[in-house]
Regions:
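Surface-exposed charge patches in extracellular/virion surface proteins
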Residues: 21, 32-36, 72, 80-82, ...
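Feature targets compositionally biased, intrinsically disordered low-complexity regions
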Residues: 22, 36-41, 60, 75, ...
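Extracellular adhesion/glycan-binding regions together with long Ser/Thr-
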Residues: 40-55, 105-153
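Generic "edge-of-domain/loop-turn" microfeature
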Residues: 9, 20-22, 27, 34, ...
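C-terminal, structured domain-capping segment
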Residues: 6, 62-77, 124-185
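Generic preference for hydrophobic/aromatic residues in regular secondary structure cores
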Residues: 21-25, 32, 67, 75, ...
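Surface-exposed interaction patch
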Residues: 4-5, 50-120
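Short, polar/proline-rich extracytoplasmic segments that appear immediately after membrane translocation
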Residues: 1-53, 165-171, 176-185
Length: 185
């Protein structure tokens, strides 16, 4: 069965200030064994049996930065951070993206639609002290699906078309997280 995937994959090298690597991860937003309502009236996609493909409540991955900096700096996401997807706009509006959490601080909170159609300004992740060598910084990324959205027919049609090969490729959702280290005077 096809799946929705979140991929986070960015490399950046700023020799004067720092070097870091941002790893990649996959999040399955769709599973083929999920039943969200046992056939109750009005439930999304679900029937009395498990769906062909149905949304999970949420999936979480991790941005991992390996940071080295000789100077005091700020690590943050910049305007290269965006979503690329072939999902219809209607579905994009129901997918929420949260970068960060209450322990690390919320870096971004919005919808896939916002990230794919709008701009992203600089968002601070963490202050980096001078003489930092090989520090690993992790930031969670959570994508959640608003299940009670009244779009059962659309979601079912997309799932059926994907599973029967009506599309040339799977539906994809890629989050490109552009990150920078900025020197702090």
């Amino acid at each position: 069965y096809a799946k929705y995937v979140l991929q986070v994959d960015t490399k950046e090298d700023s020799a004067r200030v720092a070097k870091f690597y941002l790893g990649a991860s996959e999040l399955d937003l769709f599973a083929n064994t999920y039943d969200n309502g046992d056939g109750e009236a009005g439930v999304d996609v679900a029937t009395v049996i498990d769906n062909l493909i149905a949304p999970n409540f949420e999936a979480t991955g991790t941005l991992t930065f390996d940071v080295t900096s000789e100077v005091k700096a700020t690590l943050g996401l910049d305007n290269r951070t965006k979503v690329e997807t072939n999902l219809p706009d209607d579905v994009q509006e129901d997918l929420k993206v949260v970068i960060g959490d209450t322990s690390t601080g919320i870096v971004y909170s919005g919808t896939v639609y916002d990230l794919s159609h709008g701009g992203f300004s600089f968002a601070k992740i963490k202050d980096i002290s001078a003489h930092t060598v090989g520090s690993t910084i992790t930031v969670p990324v959570t994508v959640s699906w608003a299940l009670e959205n009244g779009k059962d027919e659309l979601e079912t049609n997309l799932a059926n078309a994907q599973a029967t090969g009506d599309f040339e490729k799977e539906f994809t959702l890629s989050l490109v997280a552009g990150a920078v280290l900025t020197q702090v005077d």
